[in-house]
Amino acid sequence: MKDTIRQLIQQALTRLTDDGVLPAGLTPAIQVENTKDKSHGDFASNIAMMLAKPAGLKPRQLAEKLVAALPADASVSKVEIAGPGFLNFFQNSDALARRLEVALADERLGVRKHGDLQRVVVDLSSPNLAKEMHVGHLRSTIIGDAVARVLEFLGDVVIRQNHVGDWGTQFGMLLAHLEEKPASAESELADLEQFYRAAKKRFDESEAFADRARELVVRLQAGEPECLRLWQRFNAISLSHCQEVYERLGVRLTPDDIRGESAYNDELPGIVQALRDKGLLTESEGAQCVFLDEFRNAEGNPLPVIVQKAGGGYLYATTDLASMRYRSQVLKADRVLYFVDQRQALHFQMTFAVARRAGFVRDDTALEHMGFGTMNGADGRPFKTRDGGTVKLIDLLDEAEQRAYALVKGKNPELPEEELRHIARAVGIGAVKYADLSKHRTSDYSFNFELMLSFEGNTAPYLLYAYTRVASVFRKLGREIDEIDGSPAPEAGQELALAARLAQFGEVLGNVAEKGLPHLLCAYLYDLAGLFSSFYENCPILTADTPARQQSRLLLAALTGRTLRQGLELLGLEPLERM
């Protein structure tokens, strides 16, 4: 609907330009927003205030001319001028009903992407295989997964890339420890964190062990078969730990999505040579660097992107440049989205700039850093165990399920044990994910089990329960929610408000895909659940006073249920038929 209004405004602007009211050459970004107060219409635009100055008119005068120049459209019942010159558009209720009818008849709820379909690479999760996945990996994994799901739903081709840290000097230390204890390695590797700490302790305390670790790094980098065998064994065990976490979280990541740092090893000398051939390299204290004028420190000195150390070793930037070239030139990506901590913003700004300057990425490939904030404890500090250690992600999920189990059993002690466990898993894991996804991506947030497992407020339990309320209506009828289709005829205020919000699902998903912000979908679903609750309490469905009204309200309920279910699934949550 917003696109329709933008087109109508653009036609009016063209007409006023042709009539000499507006000067030629204006290309304003036409903004159309949803109104909060529906007595002021469904949509509003400030275009008259934006263009009043170049038109040499007062905003309200220009607004009057715009309204007069607007073409008639069946989806708009009327346009009013409010305040200093806002244009308020009222949606035609018949046109709204037709949009809902289309949504009900379509398994994709009438949602289509506006604009061309694209190939999108999503870089997400990317844990360091030297350690077990911890809470710091949660945000990249689930935010990236949610955005990837939305992109796919809109029709884009999505290529997930799990850029795991499977290479580097720390692996020499781990291989040395693995080599020392071949018999007990399997059992010790069951706890990667403990294995890493033990190897680090040996490295710090034994000069001979440290020398052996450094030697193994050199041999590993040289491709010595026995070192590669130990390295591959360690990585296989570490990756199996990661896959267990992904399956518990319900994210769409598989071993096929892994392309770690080591995959680019053979390309790194060529990356450095290509930068040299382009005249971009400068030697600084023995290291090979790229200096770009647009990146300077507080003293005004250029900042380096170091691509090769004085000793010949390569850095993260070198590997990132190789991956950017691969994703643009080989995977043919139109967009590459990097779901990586906000603290890496400068690193990505600089490597993106180098990649473009060097010609590693096509001009039409968009490189986008989707940075995120930190997950903190209740005290506002980085989330840690009581003894100050790192919290394993699998331990966090275990506790979430245990707490959810106690909560669900307390409310429904009569449920069979298997069903209790299933509900607890969906509620517990869903609560952890939703508490994160519902926050703005770039914000820090405090982790709090009590708040996230509450049935009140913008939480997973509240939304999961909202869906079960809709499902219960159709269970009482003995009908499936997906069987219901037709054209609703919303009349009452609560019906119209619910209908208008349902029609905005596609627009919300478009914004999530464009901006990489899942919290927009969370806010929409929370609002939708609240509107349904008001509708349910004020507009009887099964006891409606006429068959036509009952059918119309059933259609609204069905579309609400399907939209909630689809939205929850796009966030990576499991909808439940009953709780």
UniProtKB/Swiss-Prot annotation:
PROSITE patterns: AA_TRNA_LIGASE_I (PS00178). Keywords: Aminoacyl-tRNA synthetase, ATP-binding, Cytoplasm, Ligase, Nucleotide-binding, Protein biosynthesis. A motif ('HIGH' region) lies at residues 127-137. InterPro entries: aa-tRNA-synth_I_CS, Arg-tRNA-ligase, Arg-tRNA-synth_N, Arg-tRNA-synth_N_sf, ArgRS_core, DALR_anticod-bd, Rossmann-like_a/b/a_fold, tRNAsynth_Ia_anticodon-bd. Transmembrane segments: none annotated. It is an enzyme of class 6 (ligase). It comes from the Bacteria. GO terms for biological process: arginyl-tRNA aminoacylation. The keyword Isomerase does not apply. Its EC number is 6.1.1.19. It is found in: Cytoplasm. GO terms for cellular component: cytoplasm. GO terms for molecular function: arginine-tRNA ligase activity; ATP binding. SUPFAM superfamilies: Anticodon-binding domain of a subclass of class I aminoacyl-tRNA synthetases (SSF47323), Arginyl-tRNA synthetase (ArgRS), N-terminal 'additional' domain (SSF55190), Nucleotidylyl transferase (SSF52374). Pfam families: Arg_tRNA_synt_N, DALR_1, tRNA-synt_1d. It catalyses: tRNA(Arg) + L-arginine + ATP = L-arginyl-tRNA(Arg) + AMP + diphosphate. The keyword Transcription regulation does not apply. Belongs to the class-I aminoacyl-tRNA synthetase family. Monomer. This is Arginine--tRNA ligase. It comes from Azotobacter vinelandii (strain DJ / ATCC BAA-1303).
